């Protein structure tokens, strides 16, 4: 059985140092932890950054300065080998919230002086005792809504702070049985095969039941929201989403892995599609857009029971001609 304890320890040691560091030491910590050719990918407006010092300057130092007493509250932590064909790289996954007192403006979002929780999920590729590559996805519109802004007209699901797994067993610090990870990966792959191209020929709810638990929970991003049960997921997200888009490209992932009952993937982007109908209260544009997505899953028996989703909505809507961060900065606030 292949275990990934050393890679997990490298990431956990990095988190401990990063989370405790003052802003003027973050660059030094990253430089000692990441490789010389380190690549970091994050949601708009950060996009792709190269080098530990640049990541510290552009992302971590401003964020930690904005969130006084910032804490990392992890709900899920696991590791594994990339299951995509021809790739045996090892990745460590962390998901939860970065929480603190919103005391300084960030990305033009004005501070509230109150506690906020920024949902995040991070994939770290580890090799030769260094972090080589990171995909760090975080829900900026969710933070905007916590600060009293309304970046989107409406959403089909419920707006809430995403909880961790129902079983509270998502922190896989100890080694897991390889067979359980294989079962989780098989469930995820079956779902991708069924849903990836929207062409199974089955009624939507019947299609979903092939791979999803009847009482599944879907923790969607701000602008779409959360829902539960196959019937309500079909009504409040999957159905409206499919109806809004056409010309969906094939799915492309950078990494796909599983350990124990947990697994997930990310892409850059995962797929493209044309906005040919109404979506998130916005009209059709006829323009193609990229979907940069992280999906994390919890398996129960052989069905997917929970799904946490991070979508770069700011990037997608910017491709549709709507720069939500710029719009916020140009709007007078009282």
Model-derived segments and spans:
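C-terminal and inter-domain tail/linker signature
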Residues: 1-334
